[in-house]
Swiss-Prot record:
Cofactor(s) recorded in Swiss-Prot or TrEMBL: Zn(2+)
Enzyme Commission number: 3.4.11.-
Sites where the protein binds Zn(2+) 2: 210, 249, 358
Name recorded for this polypeptide: Leucine aminopeptidase 1
Signal sequence, start to end: 1-19
Amino acid sequence: MKLSIALALGATASTGVLAAVVPQQEPLITPQDPPTHHHQEKFLIELAPYQTRWVTEEEKWDLKLDGVNFIDITEERNTGFYPTLHAGSYVHYPPTMKHAEKVVPLLRGLSKDNMEQNLNKFTSFHTRYYRSSTGIESAKWLYSRVSDVIEQSGAAEYGATVEQFAHSWGQFSIIARIPGQTNKTVVLGAHQDSINLFLPSILAAPGADDDGSGTVTILEALRGLLQSDAIVRGNASNTIEFHWYSAEEGGMLGSQAIFSQYKRDKRDIKAMLQQDMTGYTQGALDAGRQEAIGIMVDYVDEGLTQFLKDVTTEYCGIGYIETRCGYACSDHTSASKYGYPAAMATESEMENSNKRIHTTDDSIRYLSFDHMLEHARLTLGFAYELAFAQF
């Protein structure tokens, strides 16, 4: 995830809360073919809705160094699918928390030690850059950890699965699916890749906060959720999925591939929550702010975001603060583009977030596992309440 600067070419990024998506609409201007006089591979990126540009991979990283968010829509152009954002929400979420007596005991089982152990290992890979061999190795390790959690819970006996979602660039995404009584699905997401923007293929990118913190946060929430016998046995009303996306740093490539496939398969996704950067609090404290969970209020679903605030109030020991990150700041953008209600939580207000990301210094030593535990509580409460929601 990146702190977005004010984009002169993206005035629509400040238009307030946006939500669901109308698919299959033609863009205002159909993207033109890339210039042919350069030999470098070109990628079509979108910096705001329908504001596109052809760039090289190096130019992608230059934009990110400048704090500019984008989504890589090269493949979308090839399919002829042009979704568009619009205001409003088509899913109604519970106005109150209805399962506190079940959720609170599960929250007590969440472990900071588990998250620290997992993050220590996850950051030991030289880089998790999605085109690197160590990015594939880190994905294999994460897949084995997710598989262990599913297996140890007994959920596999009732149909729970873990899938490697393959991509052309090597590093796969991971999907853990816990079936419920219907195919209506709630998704919890984080991105597993990391990047060093100075030399992505060479320099170390431990990515402790971005987004190792979100990765182990939702992993621990999955483990905690599977302490529920009702969830394990598939007695929840809805199916729950946990996603670990590849190639977010390349422009939400992994999550786009998944949600575009879900759209083709006519999957009924009722909610998607992204956790990107959940561990850094010192910036907020240095600014004289109280520790709080940052909840995005731009380019998200308004109804789902209100529900997320309610979950935070009910199940977390700290409050929330509204913040904005602009267009295409993390994988919830992909869900929204393909018509699914999405929300996002992060560690603080964006202006106080971790400035060491995308460097060799994005290290565990700067993170608060107490804060990450609050995000795990949020994730578990969100998942359980919506698992039993009547949509």
